[in-house]
């Protein structure tokens, strides 16, 4: 993410940026005195100049000003997740922000925005019950498996992939008594590490 953030920061019109990339989202938070120009360069960076027959730009969304801050706060609080209140996203945003900070591609505006959003996200999580119950895609998947297959104690399970969601799912399966947890991944070393 550091290198991608530096590439985006070097695009015309982009003054500061933070790149958030998870298994479920890719978001670019950027600051610019020329937002339309910067957005066009960011889209071209990802899509190329020849966008072809399919208008890929229609699959992107954009927020500006207070709407962008509101979106970031919804992301941090788990309101904009596949599983309402999921907890992993807060740490993922924090990592993305610190990566950008360490790379020197943020400044006062980005720093102030993210600090304010972290405060709001924490407040929403601590003052509401949004985090009650299953709060990750992995834990919801395990609950669904229990509804379909019954007790998971002693079962053998194959997890596809070795990313963070697979790690969370593996922990949830182990906690429910699954004994044979196998991992299939394109990288053998990462699969072994997770197993």
Language model segments and positions:
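A glycine-rich (often HGG/GG-containing) alpha/beta subdomain
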Residues: 1-81
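Solvent-exposed alpha-helical segments within well-ordered globular domains of core cellular machineries
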Residues: 6, 44, 70, 91, ...
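Long, contiguous hydrophobic alpha-helical segments, chiefly transmembrane helices and signal peptides
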Residues: 1, 26-29, 85, 120, ...
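Glycine/serine-rich phosphate-binding loop and adjoining beta1-alpha1 elements at the start
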Residues: 54-153
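Glycine-rich phosphate/diphosphate-binding loop of Rossmann-like nucleotide-binding domains
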Residues: 142, 146-195
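Short, surface-exposed, polar/charged, turn-prone segments marking secondary-structure boundaries
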Residues: 46-48, 56, 110-111, 186-188
């Amino acid at each position: 993410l550091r290198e991608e953030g530096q590439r985006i920061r070097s695009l015309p019109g982009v003054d500061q940026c933070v790149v958030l990339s998870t298994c479920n989202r890719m978001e670019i938070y950027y600051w610019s005195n020329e937002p339309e120009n910067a957005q066009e360069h960011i889209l071209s960076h990802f899509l190329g100049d020849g966008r072809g027959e399919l208008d890929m730009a229609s699959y992107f969304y954009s927020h500006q000003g207070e709407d962008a801050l509101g979106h970031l706060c919804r992301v941090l609080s788990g309101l904009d997740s596949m599983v309402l209140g999921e907890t992993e996203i807060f740490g993922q945003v924090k990592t993305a922000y610190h990566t950008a900070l360490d790379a020197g591609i943020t400044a006062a505006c980005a720093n102030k925005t993210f600090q304010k959003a972290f405060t709001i996200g924490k407040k929403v999580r601590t003052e509401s019950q949004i985090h009650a119950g299953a709060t990750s895609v992995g834990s919801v998947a395990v609950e669904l498996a229990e509804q379909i297959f019954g007790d998971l104690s002693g079962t053998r399970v194959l997890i596809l992939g070795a990313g963070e969601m697979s790690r969370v799912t593996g922990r949830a399966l182990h906690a429910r008594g699954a004994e044979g947890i196998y991992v299939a991944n394109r990288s053998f070393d990462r699969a072994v590490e997770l197993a």
